[in-house]
Amino acid sequence: MQPTNSEKFTEKVWEAIYRTQEMYKQAQQQQIETEHLMKALLEQDGLAISIFNKLAVPVDRVRDRTDDFIRRQPKVSGSGTSVYWGRRADALLXRAEEYRKQFEDSFISIEHLLLGYAQDSRFGKALLSEFRYPDEAKLRNAIEQVRGNQKVTDQTPENKYESLEKYGRDLTQYAREGKLDPVIGRDDEIRRTIQILSRRTKNNPVLIGEPGVGKTAIAEGLAQRILSGDVPQSLKDRKLIALDMGALIAGAKYRGEFEERLKAVLKEVTDSRGNIILFIDEIHTVVGAGATQGAMDAGNLLKPMLARGELRCIGATTLDEYRKYIEKDAALERRFQQVFVDQPSVEDTISILRGLKERYEVHHGVKISDSALVAAATLSTRYISDRFLPSKAIDLVDEAAAKLKMEITSKPEELDEVDRKVLQLEMERLSLQKENDAGSRDRLERLERELADFKEDQSKLNAQWQAEKSVITDLQKLKEEIDRVNLEIQQAERDYDLNRAAELKYGKLNELNRKVEETESQLSQIQKSGATLLREEVLESDIAEIISKWTGIPVSKLVESEMQKLLQLDDVLHQRVIGQDEAVTAVSDAIQRSRAGLSDPNRPTASFIFLGPTGVGKTELAKALAAFLFDTEEAMVRIDMSEYMEKHSVSRLIGAPPGYVGYEEGGQLTEAVRRRPYSVILFDEIEKAHPDVFNVMLQILDDGRVTDSQGRTVDFKNTIIIMTSNIGSQYIFEYGGDDDRYEEILSRVMEAMLSNFRPEFLNRIDEIIIFHSLQKAQLREIVKIQTHRLESRLARKMSLKLSDAALDFLAEGFDPVYGARPLKRAIQRELETTIAKEILRSNFTEGDTIFVDVGETERLEFKRLPSEVLTTQ
């Protein structure tokens, strides 16, 4: 039978036949024979390999023997153009045709060819007898295991064979191999799932909950219970297989191919007569999956089986996606019974983390302290509001352990510093060896001695690092071995091989535990010596550090240097904001309370209204605070309330409502705080905003949160809210620093506030702070601050010095009505302009010191000071 018509063969067989035409030419042989066809079949990642695997025949060795057989055949020279099929290859195809008829298939497939090899006296029998190949009955049995009850009705039958192996993951097998993490708690949800699965019809639970609460973990917990036999009789010895919708859709090129694959999966499940339970994670993906014009989607293919109880299916999806996809399809929704999976409490999360602790310790090769687990649960609840427990707490522990593992395997900082110093000294030595003068030789001798000392330190530190790393690595290997032995013990107990279980439990496991104790004592001795380079335990501070990296919130415990810094906050703010003692003290007290952990965790860190005339330092104090907390003024979120004068502009703060332009972009305020939850928010000139804006402010000030247009809760609990206003500034201006009239002025200002803002808004503010109008005595300090800023802008390494007379001259720019802002204009006009012109004329150059004084003409004079004058001053 010459293969001339591709329509008789499946695609894979025709590909193999086509490939043999190249093979026999490459091998320089006379004709195509059965060995060439076998090699072509083994090159495919297809059915031949699956059948050999079922028979426990090593595929690599079959491939090697086939290559050897081809090499031993006689070669011919010359380049013939015709393709010749050998007599035995022709006979093989004829036998395959007979098997096709026996199987009642429409096309010759790979399994028909393999059956034909059992009767090939030249190559097939010689090859298969070497591997003690079973008789034809066993070969047929292996083929039936792979094919199931499928018939070859099209040219791509392989898509339907072993569909569940291709498109699914056996969770019960994963549990048997110890690849699933232990599931702690969730007993009610697992029991409810089992209850629904035990129904006669519509026995399909769907797990609904927020992302990260543990929906998939419930399915894994059920797989572990099935394995341990802790389920009702109706679920004993069942298989739980997770369907991979991505794999099912991927590569389905032709119309109807996806439906064929899914039908093959469903046929395998129904043919198992209830032995297989299907788990579809992200079940909303079946709605519309694979649907093209006029084709059915996966959801519609599932519906009949789900309703009749032929298919037991567990689904999992989030609340939003369930509402968006499943609820719209009422026929699909009624076939599923809902199981709500709530977020676990902090206490339950700590229990879950304790259950997972050993797995993460073995994986990362580090120890995890219990305080770190408690910190992960409590700190993630407080500071990471847009994610859910236990996922966010587990991620924290995982990342902290990974960070510590990275530090263990990387070179320690002390050793790295010594290595760099040795490299630097060696480079200096090479340079000095080229010099011949006496001074260089003396320096070389001293350098040699210094280098010898550093090299000695280097070798000691290196030896210590390697010793510590070796002990920690040994400990990890021992723990991995204990994990593997525990898995073997569980397997032996399930198989009732009690002798093996006892041998492992009381022999090998005890020996490994003893070695672990010895290694741990060895490590603790190294650590007690105080000279340790590596740390191998994840602590609470590591968790706090990861949270700080995720959110930008300084969660870590206060170290000595930061305590000192916070105590000096009052002084730091006073250096920038002159003459506003009450305001500075109130703000610094709020920050100190927050960082010491005493502020109310359910409200913003602090909220202030700064009242006062223009130019007295209201905005400057907010900038100074942002610079202190974040080292940059740019970290302040500034909202100019003059932009929110219209009623509709409220939507710009929290995002446009659905259907409006900009809905996807979110709000200016909410997005800024979501990206940076620890920030100073300045609402500048709040009296200019529309009254409706303050409705949004109420919940921010009271509960420390607001819901944006997308339905996300944005957390303001770690923000400092500062609002500035000019209301009542005329009364403050009248006050003029007279302490006797302060109470009277305060009551008049509050009356003005009540006439502009509602009481419920003012009642939520922590403190309303009045900024006094500036006095002439404070102006010289402000001028100094402004000239220091000018000096920092002189990017040409120039210095600026002003005489007392020059400072007083610039202070004349003060106007009590406009505050300190006219000073800026005076400095710009009198100082900056002249210096700029002198630089352009090259009168001042890099390294100069510019001295400014008042001349006889009552104008500022600029001089360049020589360096000797500077040294005598």
UniProtKB/Swiss-Prot annotation:
GO molecular function term, any single one: ATP hydrolysis activity
Compartments it resides in: Cytoplasm
UniProt keyword terms in alphabetical order: ATP-binding, Chaperone, Coiled coil, Cytoplasm, Nucleotide-binding, Repeat, Stress response
Region feature (Repeat 2): 85-149
Primary location: cytoplasm
Keyword Cell membrane on entry: no
GO terms for cellular component: cytoplasm
One Gene Ontology biological process: cellular response to heat
Induction, as annotated: By stress conditions, such as excess light and low temperatures.
Ranges of residues in domain Clp R: 6-149
Region (NBD2): 562-773
Region feature (C-terminal): 774-873
InterPro entries named in the record: AAA+_ATPase, ATPase_AAA_core, Chaperonin_ClpB, Clp_ATPase_C, Clp_N_dom_sf, Clp_R_dom, ClpA/B, ClpA/B_CS1
Location of region: NBD1: 162-343
Domain remarks: The Clp repeat (R) domain probably functions as a substrate-discriminating domain, recruiting aggregated proteins to the ClpB hexamer and/or stabilizing bound proteins. The NBD2 domain is responsible for oligomerization, whereas the NBD1 domain stabilizes the hexamer probably in an ATP-dependent manner. The movement of the coiled-coil domain is essential for ClpB ability to rescue proteins from an aggregated state, probably by pulling apart large aggregated proteins, which are bound between the coiled-coils motifs of adjacent ClpB subunits in the functional hexamer.
Functional description taken from the UniProt entry: Part of a stress-induced multi-chaperone system, it is involved in the recovery of the cell from heat-induced damage, in cooperation with DnaK, DnaJ and GrpE. Acts before DnaK, in the processing of protein aggregates. Protein binding stimulates the ATPase activity; ATP hydrolysis unfolds the denatured protein aggregates, which probably helps expose new hydrophobic binding sites on the surface of ClpB-bound aggregates, contributing to the solubilization and refolding of denatured protein aggregates by DnaK.
Oligomer and partners: Homohexamer. The oligomerization is ATP-dependent.
Protein name: Chaperone protein ClpB
